[in-house]
């Protein structure tokens, strides 16, 4: 599809050069179509385009994380300060139901969460949807036992989320030590990441990116 789109754009562009005043307009439209078509091959990130608060970010990498209380779709509550009293890290995974890349990485995230359940708390936050039954069914249909948090829209602006899935790690010192936009599509990456944050050698906050795991 991408090859056909680019060839079509080239042919129309050549034709438009002979069309006088319509050339610029048509070329502009074709360029937009090409950009859209060629970008469709990147299937690891589903980008949210209609959020008006993307620029109102509160938190960034290296910041101290505030204390928040969240409630999952089953009525269980999770407070960051209480979690960090018994865990070595909190992982926030932002997703939404129709996000293909989110579904792609969930098995890897679930496996890592199960392996490091004693040391790491993983919360799956859906900031765009508060439909409890749909979220519960999604978890059941995808064999997921992670705590699913519904409809926390303020997180979009709090972290200036620009795509889904987004994974953020709050380390044992309460600092944001990791942030990644896009699906983790290789087995073992989440486990390597979790191993880093639970290690006894983790003596102070260290900000890392996905390529370091």
Role assignments for model-derived ranges:
Residues 69-90:
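A short beta-strand-turn-helix
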Residues 136-173, 181:
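Short, internal strand/loop/helix patches
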Residues 88-90, 95-98, 163:
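Short pre-active-site segment immediately N-terminal to redox-active cysteine/selenocysteine motifs
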Residues 86-90, 118-121, 144-146:
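Loop/turn elements at helix/coil->beta-strand transitions in domains of secreted/extracellular proteins
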């Amino acid at each position: 599809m991408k090859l056909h789109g680019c060839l079509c754009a080239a042919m129309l562009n050549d034709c438009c050069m002979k069309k006088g005043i319509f050339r610029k307009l048509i070329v502009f439209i074709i360029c937009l179509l090409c950009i859209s078509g060629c970008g469709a091959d990147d299937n690891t990130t589903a980008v949210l385009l209609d959020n008006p608060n993307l620029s109102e970010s509160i938190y960034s990498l290296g910041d101290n994380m505030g204390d928040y209380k969240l409630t999952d779709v089953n009525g269980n509550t999770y407070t960051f300060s209480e979690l960090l009293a018994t865990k070595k890290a909190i992982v926030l995974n932002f997703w939404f139901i129709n996000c293909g890349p989110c579904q792609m990485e969930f098995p890897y995230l679930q496996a890592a969460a199960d392996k490091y359940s004693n040391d790491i708390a993983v919360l799956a936050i859906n900031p765009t949807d508060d439909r409890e039954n749909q979220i519960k069914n999604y978890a059941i249909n995808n064999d997921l036992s992670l705590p699913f948090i519904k409809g926390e829209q303020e997180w979009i602006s709090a972290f200036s989320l620009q795509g889904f899935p987004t994974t953020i790690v709050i380390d044992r010192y309460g600092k944001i030590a990791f942030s990644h936009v896009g699906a983790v599509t290789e087995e073992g990456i989440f486990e390597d990441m979790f191993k880093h944050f639970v290690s006894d050698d983790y003596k102070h906050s260290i900000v890392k990116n996905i390529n370091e795991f």
